[in-house]
Amino acid sequence: MTTRNLTDEQIAEFREAFSLFDRDQDGNITSNELGVVMRSLGQSPTAAELQDMINEVDADGNGTIDFTEFLTMMARKMKDTDNEEEVREAFKVFDKDGNGYITVEELTHVLTSLGERLSQEEVADMIREADTDGDGVINYEEFSRVISSK
C-alpha cells in the first residue's frame, strides 16, 4: 500500500496521531518524541531501536520523521496488517474444525478439494517440514512462517 491509496479520512486520522507524537509541534518527530509516545503505550524501546524505526522511513536523512514520512510508515503498517489478515483467513480454510491446528487429515482434505493427488506420506512430509515444534500438527505461527517464506 502506498500513501496514494490512503483515504482522506485515514490521512486526517494520521495527521491527528502525528500531532500527538510531535510534542513540540515543529513538524518533525524525533527519536525522543517517538520514545515518549511508545513508553506511554507500554513499550520500552532502546534508543537504538527508536533510531532504527526513524531510519526506516527517514527519506530525507535528517534524523526525524516529517508528516509525509509518517504517512509512508503508516501505509506500510496497514499493508502488513492486510497481509496478516489474509494469512489468518488462509489458515482458517485449512483448519476445518477451528481448533487452531492443521492436521494431516485437514491438509489432505483441502489439497484433494484443490485437485492435488498426494499420498498420505507426501502430506505427512509437508506437515513435518512445517512442524517446527514437532507436535505432529501445524499451528498458526508455523503456518504463517511457511507462507511468509514463499
Swiss-Prot record:
One of its GO terms (cellular component) is myosin I complex. InterPro entries: CALM/Myosin/TropC-like, EF-hand-dom_pair, EF_Hand_1_Ca_BS, EF_hand_dom. Ca(2+) 4 binds at residues 131, 133, 135, 142. Ca(2+) 2 binds at residues 58, 60, 62, 64, 69. Coiled coil: none annotated. Its main location: cytoplasm. GO terms for molecular function: calcium ion binding; enzyme regulator activity. Calmodulin mediates the control of a large number of enzymes, ion channels and other proteins by Ca(2+). Among the enzymes to be stimulated by the calmodulin-Ca(2+) complex are a number of protein kinases and phosphatases. This is Calmodulin. It comes from Schizosaccharomyces pombe (strain 972 / ATCC 24843). The gene is cam1.
